A protein has these predicted regions:
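Bacterial N-terminal signal peptides that target proteins for export
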Residues: 1-10
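Hydrophobic membrane-insertion alpha-helices, especially the h-region
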Residues: 9-18
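A short, N-terminal "cap"/entry segment at the start of jelly-roll beta-barrel domains
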Residues: 17, 21-78, 153
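Conserved short histidine dyad/triad with adjacent acidic residue
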Residues: 57-61, 71-89, 123-126, 147-148
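Short, conserved beta-strand element in jelly-roll/cupin
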Residues: 87-104, 144
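Short beta-strand His + acidic residue motifs that chelate non-heme Fe in jelly-roll/DSBH
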Residues: 104-105, 122-123, 128-135
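Short acidic-glycine-tyrosine-enriched beta hairpin
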Residues: 108-125
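A short hydrophobic beta-strand segment most commonly corresponding to one strand
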Residues: 120-122, 136-151
Length: 153
C-alpha cells in the first residue's frame, strides 16, 4: 500500500511539473509572437535645413542587430529645465533615455515625447536643429558613432 501511495505521489508531482513547464513554454511562445519591434526616433536635417523626425525599426537578424561601432560611452544627468534654444546634435550619436522624461521638438512644431527606453538617433548636425525640454530628472546614455556621415533621406 505504501509503495502504491508513493508511486501515485511521484506521478502527481511529475504531472504537476509537466503541466507547469508546458504552461510556461506556451506563455513564452505567446510573448514571442506578440513582441513589439524596437523603434528608434531618427532626428535628421531635411533638404530645407529643418530638422525632421521619423520612426525607424531596428532590424534584428537572429535576435540581434548588426554591430554598431561607437567611439565611446557617455552618461548624462540633467535636471528639469525650460526648453533649450534650437540646436543641432554635436555629433551623430544614439541617445538612450534610462530614466526621466523629456520632449524633443523639430520643424513644424512636431513634439516627440521621450521616456525610459526611448532611443534617438541624432543626425541633425546642420541646419536649424531641434529643441530639447527636460520635464523630469533625466539620465541618458550617449553612444557617439564612428561613422559621422548621416544617411541620406
Amino acid at each position: 500500500m505504501r509503495l502504491i501511495t508513493g508511486r501515485l505521489a511521484a506521478a502527481a508531482l511529475v504531472s504537476l511539473f509537466v503541466l507547469t513547464w508546458r504552461a510556461h513554454v506556451d506563455q513564452d511562445v505567446v510573448v514571442a509572437q506578440t513582441r513589439k519591434p524596437i523603434m528608434i526616433t531618427r532626428i535628421y536635417t531635411g533638404p530645407d535645413g529643418q530638422s525632421r523626425a521619423e520612426q525607424v525599426e531596428l532590424k534584428l537578424n537572429g535576435g540581434a542587430s548588426e554591430m554598431i561601432k561607437a567611439t565611446g560611452v557617455q552618461f548624462s544627468s540633467r535636471p528639469p529645465a525650460p526648453a533649450s534654444d534650437w540646436h543641432v546634435g554635436p555629433m551623430r550619436q544614439y541617445v538612450i533615455t534610462l530614466s526621466g522624461r523629456a520632449e524633443l521638438e523639430v520643424a513644424g512644431g512636431k513634439k516627440i515625447p521621450v521616456g525610459p527606453g526611448h532611443i534617438d538617433l541624432v543626425e541633425d548636425l546642420t541646419g536649424k536643429g531641434h529643441i530639447t525640454k527636460v520635464l523630469e530628472d533625466r539620465v541618458t546614455l550617449q553612444l557617439p558613432l564612428v561613422d559621422q556621415t548621416p544617411r541620406s533621406n
